[in-house]
Amino acid sequence: MSLSIDVTSLPSISSSIFKNESSSTTSTLSGKSIGRSEQYISPDAEAFNKYMLSKSLEDIGPSDSASNDPLTSFSIRSNAVKTNADAGVSMDSSTQSRPSSNVGCDQLDFSLTKGVNVSANLDSCISISTDHKKEKSKKDKSRKHYPRIEADSDSEDYVLDDSDSDDGKCKNCKYKKKYFALRMRMKRVAMQLIEDL
């Protein structure tokens, strides 16, 4: 992946930024930038009034203020210095060290002599496994196999006395043995179901 930074659309930045050759030309920042001193002078109300009265109302805008306090703004502005790209920025500016030029003291000059080159490599590997092991569901695991009940179908020879049906006894039944075995198995299955629940 390659990343390039395009700064040609920014105001007042020359296209020589991407050349690796030194240039003595400087490009001026658009608007008014202030090179401030770390030493603040005490606000001079008389000089501030003279400065503000010398400007028309249309000329006073946001660029005239570097602080919310107008007097502090003026003291910063009076300490501003025009900087040179070769000489650097003076932090201890004084009235004597200010260059005598036609350019105002609220301007900052700069030059960039080195190119900007940003390069980065991005390697990524994604592996997706779609193998799915079929697992037995919990229902299948929890299902218990109950004993299968097998009973032969009764034939027409099956006889049950109506008189004995009330007390649950079968006297004249030829399937009496099979009947009791089946009833015993049914009872066991019913008891197993009740225990599981």
Swiss-Prot record:
- Protein's UniProt keywords contain RNA-binding: yes
Give the top-rank taxon of the lineage listed in the UniProt record for this protein: Viruses
Name the major location.
host cell
Q: Which GO terms describe its biological process?
A: viral genome replication
Which HAMAP family does the UniProt record give? ROTA_NSP5
Known partners and oligomeric status: Homodimer. Interacts with VP1. Interacts with VP2. Interacts with NSP2; this interaction leads to up-regulation of NSP5 hyperphosphorylation and formation of virus factories. Interacts with NSP6. Participates in the selective exclusion of host proteins from stress granules (SG) and P bodies (PB). Also participates in the sequestration of these remodeled organelles in viral factories.
Q: What is this protein called?
A: Non-structural protein 5
This chain's source organism reads Rotavirus A (strain RVA/Human/United States/P/1974/G3P1A[8]) (RV-A)
The organism that produces this protein has a lineage beginning with:
Viruses, Riboviria, Orthornavirae, Duplornaviricota, Resentoviricetes
